[in-house]
Amino acid sequence: MILHAQTKHGKPGLPWLVFLHGFSGDCHEWQEVGEVFADYSRLYVDLPGHGGSAAISVDGFDDVTDLLRKTLVSYNILDFWLVGYSLGGRVAMMAACQGLAGLCGVIVEGGHPGLQNAEQRAERQRSDRQWAQRFRTEPLTAVFADWYQQPVFASLNDDQRRELVALRSNNNGATLAAMLEATSLAVQPDLRANLSARTFAFYYLCGERDSKFRALAAELAADCHVIPRAGHNAHRENPAGVIASLAQILRF
């Protein structure tokens, strides 16, 4: 079994760019940014429970990494960068720390490196279970209306929230709930030590208005790019800013 993905081919000899979306996104999420880099072959992945991979279920990050590895092999992708936002960034960091043959580097936008104590994990588990129950049982428009009121999305205005609620409500609530629980921060290990000892290039992007993740970025041994005029979802709020950072990283 492999993950559903869309491919766009570039020039031979350059590494692939493998894009991983955030929770409730899909393979289209990164394309406004990714299609600027047409010299590179691009793979836009649907993570388990999302988009064309909605029917794929996992028990945890190990399963996601295994599926990602098999997907890369199936497309004969031998050299690549992982580019991930939020959940996709966490998947990218986890997979990279577990080891992926051919990995050139990891570019993470607003991805959490992991909670650091049992109390934080217990609280996050309670919260994610409550959200998962709502995703399973309530209309998605109502759930996402509340989801985007969370502090991490404070930089969004009302129009941006309405647009995101409408977009994300096309998902399957049950499969979102399953993926939320399987990849909760409560079950993700703290990756700070692994990232400090890494053997791959590591870049971190965060929005200027995303105070939580700017603080987290300062804790990581990564080259950090702060995206101006953007909050947590920087590639949506300021795609040009993210494109500029990726171009600098890739020496485009």
Curated annotation (Swiss-Prot):
MF term (GO), any: 2-succinyl-6-hydroxy-2,4-cyclohexadiene-1-carboxylate synthase activity
Source taxon at top rank: Bacteria
Pathway listed: Quinol/quinone metabolism; 1,4-dihydroxy-2-naphthoate biosynthesis; 1,4-dihydroxy-2-naphthoate from chorismate: step 3/7; Quinol/quinone metabolism; menaquinone biosynthesis
Keyword Repeat: no
Subunit structure: Monomer.
Functional description taken from the UniProt entry: Catalyzes a proton abstraction reaction that results in 2,5-elimination of pyruvate from 2-succinyl-5-enolpyruvyl-6-hydroxy-3-cyclohexene-1-carboxylate (SEPHCHC) and the formation of 2-succinyl-6-hydroxy-2,4-cyclohexadiene-1-carboxylate (SHCHC).
PANTHER family noted in UniProt: 2-SUCCINYL-5-ENOLPYRUVYL-6-HYDROXY-3-CYCLOHEXENE-1-CARBOXYLATE SYNTHASE, PROTEIN PHYLLO, CHLOROPLASTIC
Stated name of the protein: 2-succinyl-6-hydroxy-2,4-cyclohexadiene-1-carboxylate synthase
Organism: Shigella dysenteriae serotype 1 (strain Sd197)
Source species taxonomy: Bacteria, Pseudomonadati, Pseudomonadota, Gammaproteobacteria, Enterobacterales
Gene coding for it: menH
